[in-house]
């Protein structure tokens, strides 16, 4: 009898220990996952020769999980908990640890904007963007649209791997403003003969990690794009994002980015990133009367303006619709850059940018209007 009681007591004790251990493990796992976030870990330039395996080890040894190592940025995207972040910031090989922020699309029959920026003047001369490659870094492009010529692309959205499907419609709309075909249907783009490339970095909700955008820009560099359009942005800066944008520009690419839809806030800049970086052309929005759109972000970083109110363009499923936003203004600038390059293929990206800015039509205070409304006819002279 005593032996039976002893056995029951032992069994109960073992069960209790197992239950407590399991509960503790579960609590630890839950606690760890709840504090894990996405970060970008940058390594010091003196460590540029460090192997990919060694960089991965530095992060893994601190408990982090490497998601992606970049090609042109000496950094890696990783999932880290708070402890790993603190330890990595102390590591002598690490230059910075920054949150992998999320960017969003800036969204609100021949579109009036095409005439407003004087694109038809170049069309009549036979310049329509031929042999110019434009990367639309966005939510993808519906390549089945009969009014679009999509030549290639890639997706960096892990859950949406097809760059030719556009769940939010944003990228398809942007693409049409840049290069909708000169045919008997739909709308006309600024640069109808330009080659479009769908670089998907935003998901169907219109959001994307900065690391996805970095991957997209790296793809554009590696695939020798001439122009990058980024109708997206976020409120937070990023060393890694700035590095790759600067690399794109130093590689000869014209980079146009939406200034943002935050309106104005006194004397404070509301321009988002990456438009805020000096190497990009930051684009604000005006209406058909050249009045600044109330939603258009303002700041000293603003470079030029373009039409961005009630812009008619392509939508998925072979349809069309009108959107508002600096997202809609930016492709007018990207398309204009493609037009200029089709007329002057030997011009550098710096020359293209200088011409777009120096020939822009003055509209008012540069804090709100930058250099003014682009005039591609004058810019291409």
From Swiss-Prot:
Disulfide bonds: none annotated. Secretion of subtilisin is associated with onset of sporulation, and many mutations which block sporulation at early stages affect expression levels of subtilisin. However, subtilisin is not necessary for normal sporulation. Residues 1-29 form the signal peptide. GO terms for cellular component: extracellular region. It is found in: Secreted. Ca(2+) 1 binds at residues 108, 147, 181, 183, 185, 187. It comes from Bacillus subtilis subsp. amylosacchariticus. This is Subtilisin amylosacchariticus. GO terms for biological process: proteolysis; sporulation resulting in formation of a cellular spore.
